[in-house]
Design a protein with these regions (language model features):
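Charged substrate- and nucleic-acid-binding regions of tRNA-handling and nucleotidyl-transfer enzymes
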Residues: 21, 81-164
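Divalent metal-dependent catalytic cores for phosphoryl transfer on phosphate-bearing substrates
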Residues: 1-88
Length: 164
């Protein structure tokens, strides 16, 4: 714009190959590359969660994709503050993200569905179990109770894993 503020649409996607190339040149290891790529890919979604006022379930799922949710919040806060000053809502966004991170950590402290729990409700062990567990975790992080997440998963994936 005329004030010298630049925005790069989809920089979180376009930046990943550049980031990987740069870090590889300086000898970053595989774990460091994975961490930095993950942070780069996800950091703009934190802003979307704030500006669209998405629910806890959505921020829980975002944080669950992150290698380090705490660092993702710190990166988003730094990104919002940009050139050293605060954006109009950067303090509010920081508070929002910290509250959502606390909600995510609380959700993680609650029991999560296990393969044994799904099997006890009639699912058969097999190739579909990993996908079923992923779905049960997603439901739990979105606010479903433990029993409800298990029940919905068994209904969706079938007691016999029919769609393997």
């Amino acid at each position: 714009d005329q004030n010298g503020n630049y925005q790069s649409c989809e920089h979180e996607i376009a930046g990943v190959p550049l980031l990987s190339a740069m870090l590889s040149r300086i000898g970053a290891g595989k774990d460091m590359l994975a961490y930095c790529e993950n942070m780069c890919r996800l950091h703009m979604r934190t802003h979307i969660c704030f500006y669209m006022n998405l629910g806890e379930g959505q921020t829980n799922l975002l944080f669950d994709e992150s290698i380090c949710p705490h660092d993702l919040v710190l990166l988003a806060v730094c990104d919002a503050r940009g050139k050293g000053g605060c954006t109009e809502k950067s303090d509010e966004e920081e508070q929002f993200l910290k509250e959502r991170l606390a909600a995510y950590e609380k959700a993680l402290s609650m029991p999560m569905p296990s393969g044994d729990m799904l099997i006890a409700q009639g699912m058969k062990a097999g190739r579909g179990m990993a996908q079923a567990l992923k779905e049960a975790r997603r439901l739990r992080l979105c606010g479903a109770g433990l029993e409800d997440a298990i029940r919905q998963t068994v209904i969706k994936f079938g007691k016999e894993n029919d769609h393997e």
